[in-house]
């Protein structure tokens, strides 16, 4: 089963609304669903050259709070970004989901970059695996959506779900606590007028399946 969606995201500068159509950012996403529970997601963005530069191009997924363990193959073990990699290495890392959730109010943070695959599982080892054949991606976990405004971090820490961001195009570090990192890499910004695409797959897994990826 396939579902295709297309959006036009208008950009307003307070001018004549009739001029906005020519300044839209176009966004398309295709979902392919399979009988075995596998889901493929492909996204494409055409950013208007006059539009504001987004913090990232990503998919925001609502995950069950029963998925309490994270295992990933990518940069770690601490948070890393496209332009700041800390003293990280590329390896397989495991952590509780709660330890990966930032306790501050910034909408973006706690990223793990250059990820090849990510598994989120419950206590029995059952869960989902996110992987991509075409792109390395970044991810972060939170207890609130990026657009949600809370007065205090504690307002959202007990939410009965976990928010997973799959980031296909990050724009570098946006967290002040890591601003002193000095290991910089190129291609860590999103340029206005860019055409960007990324795809990934979500696969139901058990502990045995995850072990096969290691």
Regions found by a protein language model. Give the residues of each.
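Beta-strand/loop-rich accessory regions of lumenal/periplasmic or secreted enzymes
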Residues: 1-214
